[in-house]
Amino acid sequence: ISIDSSGEGLYGNFFNIGLGGSKQDGKIAPERNITTQWDGPWIGETAVTDGGWSAEMFIPWSALSMPEGSQERRIAIAMFRKVAYLDERYSFPPLPFSQARFISAFEPVRIDKVNPRQQWEVYPYVSATSDEIRNEADGRGGIDVAWRPSTNLQLTATVNPDFGSIESDDVVVNLTAYETFYPEKRLFFLEGNEVFVTSPRSNPRGPSGPGGSGGRQSVQTYRMEPTTLLNTRRIGGSAKHVEIPDYLTVSGVEQSKPTELVGAVKAVGQSGGLRYGLLTAFEKEVEWRGVWNNTDREMTLKSDGRDFGVVRLLYESAGGGGRQSIGYMGTLASNPLNDAVV
């Protein structure tokens, strides 16, 4: 099932469940721009009956981004069923892949008295690490906070975040001249990230990217992509701005280490047809272990971390049987050597 919670074909979510209980969810941007990194709080169960099968889903309204409304609210839905052994796909309303319209063609539905309450979410953590080779131990703690004062505004913040539990990336064999963009898997950056994506208004088949089965994937035939101004994987990534003195040797392993964050703040919301987003993040001081070339004595090379800032404004209108949109995005990446403003 797919739900256009805006009611105007501006944004939505999809929820899939298989007969064996497997689940998948994600977000939808106009028209058929689908991302699967989002992980929503919902429940689904299936069962085989004497006459066939059944499926039930419980999707809380608070999991969806919804514009501020009155007692009666307009949304749109679409339902899909895939019969694997026949390789057939059914949908209501009919939404063939050859059709440019997708989310704006969902079936309108009116609902009453749906106005999710404001929400608080707090995730503290404590972790410890031990390095037996260097005979070192380290402990740390931090907190993630999310606040949704209304259905059309969400504020999230993280202090000393712990991204060590994030699953690793798949191995991608890229023999092209184009950079591989790995998907974002950190929850803080996933929530509301669709606002920061500059996407085409009509995308019948979906974007290109790594394909194939198993852990080793190959890059498919290159197709023109939207302008990418924000790649959040570079926030907290390996430091590229550190200058290494000639008398010092730093291993490639040290240089490829991710940089820890001091904290980050993000605000995402909407007012009518205007959607907006603000993201800022601050990295900790970079510390690399190096070796003096002449003495083989170890030393620590230090450098200030980077600061990041992003502002996004997007106005969309689906009135008059057409779609109009105009947007702005500004980015800042600041480090001790230079500042990049786009």
PLM ranges: what are they?
Residues 1-317, 327, 337-339:
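Structural preference for beta-rich elements and adjacent junctions enriched in aromatics
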Residues 322-326:
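Long, ordered, helix-rich scaffold segments
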Residues 330:
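Cysteine-dependent hydrolase recognition
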